[in-house]
Design a protein with these regions (language model features):
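Glycine/threonine-rich beta-strand-loop-alpha-helix active-site module
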Residues: 75-127
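ATP/NTP phosphate-donor binding region
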Residues: 1-91
Length: 127
């Protein structure tokens, strides 16, 4: 079954689904005035990663790849946060499965709210 029409759902998060919808990513990030993306993925060698990265760089945005190849550990998350901050990123994008998506969400949260993973997981720091 071919998907001929896409759809968009907006709750507290935005979900966009449909064929070739990745071409809308630069416009969405531009609307939010984002300039430098920490792009979390399983592999920077994925064709989809390369396509989206090209779309972003063609739109004048910088892309910092970050690979998450396993279930993310505290060290993987905190290292991603360190790269996000050191590189001056202002948003995350995730391409991959649950581990990649979860890692990108936590990296972004830590970059904005400060601290490390253990502060929230072990010491009860509120978001």
């Amino acid at each position: 079954m071919a998907i001929t029409n896409g759809f968009e759902m907006v709750f507290n998060r935005r979900l966009i689904f449909g064929e070739n919808k990745v071409t809308e990513i630069p416009g969405i990030l531009n609307w939010y005035n984002k300039k430098k993306v920490l792009f979390v993925t399983f592999s920077a060698e994925f064709d989809a990663f390369k396509k989206i990265s090209s779309l972003l760089t063609d739109a004048g945005m910088a892309v910092v790849p970050y690979e998450v190849k396993t279930e993310p550990t505290l060290q993987i998350i905190d290292h991603g946060r360190d790269i996000y901050v050191a590189e001056g990123c202002d948003c995350t994008i995730a391409l991959g499965g649950g581990s990649v998506v979860d890692a990108a969400k936590v990296i972004g949260m830590l970059a904005v709210n400060g601290g490390d993973t253990e502060d929230y997981q072990m010491r009860g720091k509120a978001v």
